[in-house]
Amino acid sequence: MAAAAPASTGSKGVVRQVIGPVLDVEFPAGKLPKILNALRIEGTNTAGEAIGLTAEVQQLLGDHRVRAVAMSGTDGLVRGMEALDTGSPIAVPVGEATLGRIFNVLGEPVDEQGPVNTNVTSPIHREAPKLTELETKPKVFETGIKVIDLLAPYRQGGKIGLFGGAGVGKTVLIQELINNIAKEHGGVSVFGGVGERTREGNDLYEEFKESGVINADDLSKSKVALCYGQMNEPPGARMRVGLSALTMAEHFRDVNKQDVLLFVDNIFRFVQAGSEVSALLGRMPSAVGYQPTLGTDVGALQERVASTLEGSITSIQAVYVPADDLTDPAPATTFAHLDATTVLNRALASKGIYPAVDPLDSTSTMLQPAVVGDEHYRTARAVQSTLQRYKELQDIIAILGLDELSEDDRQTVDRARKIEKFLSQPFFVAEIFTGMPGKYVKLEDTISGFNQILAGDLDSLPEQSFYLVGNIDEVKAKAEKIAAESK
C-alpha cells in the first residue's frame, strides 16, 4: 500500500477527519507522505484565532489518506484545513546550545529565554547503533556515590531502573549524578520528563538552578538539557518526548564523543501514551489493554541507549509500577532491558540515611567477580550478608534488647549499624541545605573503607563518626573530633 506512493516534500493535503488527537489527511495521488513524516497544519479556527500544530504520520489508509497523531491539542481544528508534508520526521535542536534550556517534544524552547542559538537539528527517529559500533566489554560507570558503586554498580552505556515513592530523594539523587558526571567525567546530561506533573517539572528546573546544575547567568556553563512532555499534553507528545530527549543525548555521544546521562521520568508514562495512541489508531489491544506493539516500542527506545566506541549514553529511568504489580506488562517489559536497579527506601530516609538507597533490594548485573574483580565482589557480598543478619536480628532486639544477643551477634549488629551509617554521604547539590561540603568517593576508597569495618579495625570508633562522611579517613578524623569534644 505504501510502496506505490513516493514521498514528496511540500505536498499539501486536506484534513478529512479529526477524532481527538488523531487526524485523517487526504493527499493528491502519488504525493503521500512517508510514515513518521511530520505534517504541519496551520489556519484559523471558527472563532478566527490562528492555530498551528504538528502531527506525525502513523498509518497509510488507502484512498490517498494517511492517519496522523497530533503533538499538541487539536481544539479548533476543522475539516478542510490544509496540511503540509514537511518531508522529514520531527527534528529537534542538538548540541551545546540545548544546555540549560527546556524544550517540548518538537524541540521548541518553552522556558521564555528566547530562541535557541543553533541551526543544527536531528530527526528523532533513527536506527540503534550497529553491533560493530558498540563497546561490548562491560565497564563500570563510577558515580562517586558509595552505596551505588559498591552494591549496585552502574554499567557504562547501561539502563538503570530507579524505584521510589514521593519524598524519598529521587530528585536529589538525580541532581547529584548530573553534577558528578559533569565534574568527574566531563560529560553532560539530558532529562526527559515523560508524562509527569507540570509542577514537578517546574520544581526540578528551579532546583537545578538553585544547585548550580543549570547556570542561570551563563547557560553555556549548564550541565543539563531538559525536554518535557507533561501529563496534560496529548498522548502523541508524551509518546515522542522520550525520543526527543534521546536524540539530544545521541548528539553529545556521537558528535561530541562524550559520556552522557539520560534521565527518563517516567518510563511507564511512555508506555501508557503508546497504549492511548494505539487504541485511537484502531489496533487490537493485547494483555491488560496495552498496545500489541509494546515490546517493539520499548525496544526501539531502549536499544538506542548504548555505549559505543566513541562515547556512551547511560540511562537512569524512573519506573512507576502500577498498583505495585511487578507482573504488569509495562514494568515487566521494561525490566528485561535493565542492567541495574536502584531502590529508594522510605524507612532509611526516615532514619536520616541519605541517599536512601536500599542496600539489600538494589541489584546490578555488573556485580560479578569477572566484571568488578574478586575484592569488590567479596566486600559487597560481605556487606550485604552483615546487613541481612542485622535485619533478621531486629525483631529480637525490639523484644528482648541488645543484651540478650550472643557476643558474635552483638558484634555483627555494631558493624552493621556502622556500615548503614557509612553508606550515607553528603551531596554536592545538597550543600545549600545541609551546610556540609559534598563528597565524591573513589571506588577503591569505598572498598577499602568497608573492608576495614568488616575486619573489625574500626570497632573502637563511635557509630556517629561514620554518618554523612566521604572516605574512611574522614571517619577517623571525625572520631578524633568527637573524642576531643567529649573531654
UniProtKB/Swiss-Prot annotation:
EC id: 7.1.2.2
Protein location: Cellular thylakoid membrane
UniProt cross-references to InterPro entries, sorted A to Z: AAA+_ATPase, ATP-synt_VA_C, ATP_synth_F1_bsu, ATPase_a/bsu_AS, ATPase_alpha/beta_chains, ATPase_F1/V1/A1_a/bsu_N, ATPase_F1/V1/A1_a/bsu_N_sf, ATPase_F1/V1/A1_a/bsu_nucl-bd
Keyword Transport: yes
Residue positions binding ATP: G164, G165, A166, G167, V168, G169, K170, T171
Reactions this protein catalyses: ATP + H2O + 4 H(+)(in) = ADP + phosphate + 5 H(+)(out)
GO CC terms of this entry: plasma membrane-derived thylakoid membrane; proton-transporting ATP synthase complex
Topology relative to the membrane: Peripheral membrane protein
Gene Ontology molecular function terms on file: ATP binding; ATP hydrolysis activity; proton-transporting ATP synthase activity, rotational mechanism
Keywords: ATP synthesis, ATP-binding, CF(1), Hydrogen ion transport, Ion transport, Membrane, Nucleotide-binding, Thylakoid, Translocase, Transport
PROSITE patterns xrefs: ATPASE_ALPHA_BETA
Keyword Endoplasmic reticulum: no
Protein family according to the UniProt entry: Belongs to the ATPase alpha/beta chains family.
Assembly, per entry: F-type ATPases have 2 components, CF(1) - the catalytic core - and CF(0) - the membrane proton channel. CF(1) has five subunits: alpha(3), beta(3), gamma(1), delta(1), epsilon(1). CF(0) has four main subunits: a(1), b(1), b'(1) and c(9-12).
NCBIfam families: atpD (TIGR01039)
The protein's role, per its UniProt record: Produces ATP from ADP in the presence of a proton gradient across the membrane. The catalytic sites are hosted primarily by the beta subunits.
Name of the protein this chain belongs to: ATP synthase subunit beta
UniProt source species: Synechococcus sp. (strain CC9311)
